[in-house]
Amino acid sequence: SAQLRYSVKPKQNDLRFVEEGVRMKRKIKIIVNPVSGSGRRKKALRMIDKHLDREKFEFEIQKTEYHRHAIELTNQAVAEGCEAVIIAGGDGSINEVGATLAGTNVALGIIPAGSGNGLSRSLGISMNPKFAVENINNFNFRTIDTGLANGMPFMNMAGVGFDAAVADAFHKQKMRGFIKYFLLGLKTLREYKLQTYSIVADGREFERRAHLISMANSPQYGNDALVAPKALVDDGMLDAVVVNPFPFYQYFVLFYRLFQGTLNESPHIKTFKFKEMKITQERPDVSH
């Protein structure tokens, strides 16, 4: 029997993050994921120690020790009256902290320290931790949207199907990187079984047999892989990307398009903006 997997909608102007601007004294908490991209994380810690303005901030640094610990630390920061929580980590940690802060008056600050850094890149945050820390020092705010997938907030992407299967396999790898992701995609494509999705988007009903459906709040997965080039983090909408069936050789073409920002121009891709969407699947499948 069919299973409802996603009820997805954006929440407009739901999360603030720290941008360049006016300098102010603030109480903040810094959360560090110690297993996130070890080289980036170590450099981030050095840059925090060297460049964070101690005259402007009252702060403490806490490291996550177990799965979802960042959520607990973020809730503590809110209870303690912090005005911002700064996360030095990758997309997973950033999403945990951001989702916890969504709907509060506490801002999210990001020092990118992961392997993909999709949301950070979409927001124009420097991949250089020195500049990211200096950005925190300036302490200006920008408000962005979040998405809701089955009631759970997300900052960047949600989806079902092939890309979720690749992401699941990728996260289990000790060695990561562009080539590893490409090869895992090839392997998963050979094994992955497509299914038909029943979709209701803002009252429009249709069916699609597809490799995947992504719901994007921002343009990219990470590493400048632009799955939804026209997505905006502050337009009050989410961008749906439906990858229709394609011949095996087209994987190479689509992968190239993904990094050229032209995926939406492929005849195998359907994109549209929406405010609310419900997806029903033929069978349970991995999601993200």
Model-predicted regions and their roles:
Residues G92-V106:
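Short Gly/Thr/Asp-enriched flexible loops that form oxyanion-binding sites at enzyme active sites
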Residues G159, S214-A228:
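Glycine-rich phosphate/pyrophosphate-binding beta-alpha loops
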Residues R41, A201, L232, V242-H288:
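ATP/nucleoside-binding phosphotransfer catalytic cores, i.e., glycine-rich phosphate-binding loops
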